[in-house]
């Protein structure tokens, strides 16, 4: 399929525009080269992007078990709510009395999310998860500085953490202390005690953790950090496993970010902007980014205006639709689906941890790689030929040849059974003809790419002939 830059004919246009009826303002800056834009009809443009859409894979056209990403179905009624003229047609600089409905959306969303998480206050400014992490860490830093405690310069992060955790801590000006996990994938309490000291600003943790297990020592973990004078930050990436069942605030966490585009069903992965609201306990409220008014201790705005408002509307519609009973039921079904798949595959594929998982599970293909030279990459690519999006590959880093599978609660048993059969048939094919998997995928519009060259010599813009 040609790039859109390779299509068209000079002089062809979509629309005829009237002559400009206002004076032309000369800005005194001119291009050195002609602007190389394609010239196509509307029909050609429509066909081009419709063709691209047909090649894409999303939750609307196939199973999408991308671990740690919660690629659940996005209810279309939420899109209708966000498209209402009173929400879609407003401007953040309108007079306050004309946007009271929008302000009510923020108020309700804050109430419900605080109830779900056990927090006392929330900001919706952060644009997505990592932005939320950065904002939450700035709250922790502002808190310690307000107490004159300038020596707390380190953030503790487990070795199984999302890569954004240490990156966000570094951006916030902290040094990162990584602590190893135990063999069961959970936090090593002895190593944590050794790491906590007078220079500890806080701990960043996901629970359930990145290998899909709930750390039963969570109360002891947060107590150790608090006793050392640090604060506890909850990465909400895996909240979909426990939403409405257990609250991070009750586990001892002081700050949390949520991914509305994961747990609360708003589109992501190319389907729309994210939203990473940050919640906190009452003692951290003064440091939040200002909403209507910025207090003297506020860290200041982290995004223009109020954040991605339309995403908040969709998440609020989701919460109100499911209600107090539906939200924990969704989490329970997410856990049930993950355990069903794990148990149906465990006789062939080696699981990284032989325990009941939460919302996702991790396989290790280390034995296959060693015995027949079939890697996690080969299995993942083969799934594409069956219309299944690959699981997350080679993550978490503490598991060799990892595939992380998260089916989510919105998949039916029939879909899970079909996916299980595909996984099993690929395994048998790998055993019978391992070389064939090195060529996969063979049925997709684009075959296997040279990812090493793409990473080392990326072509980031169209250059032309």
Task: State what each model feature region is.
Residues 1-121, 246, 301-302, 319-465:
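Non-catalytic terminal extensions of PLP-dependent enzymes
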Residues 57-77, 125-133, 264-279, 307-311, ...:
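Conserved phosphate/anionic-ligand binding catalytic regions in large, soluble enzymes, centered on
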Residues 101-104, 131-297, 373-374, 401:
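Conserved PLP-enzyme active-site core in the AAT-like
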Residues 107-111, 117-120, 125-136, 140:
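Long, K/E/R/D-enriched contiguous segments that form extended
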Residues 119, 152, 199-201, 227-231, ...:
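Active-site lining segments that contact anionic ligands and/or coordinate catalytic metals
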Residues 123, 177-179, 391:
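General small-molecule cofactor/ligand-binding pocket signal
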Residues 273-342:
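Mobile "lid/hinge" segments at catalytic clefts and subdomain interfaces of large enzymes
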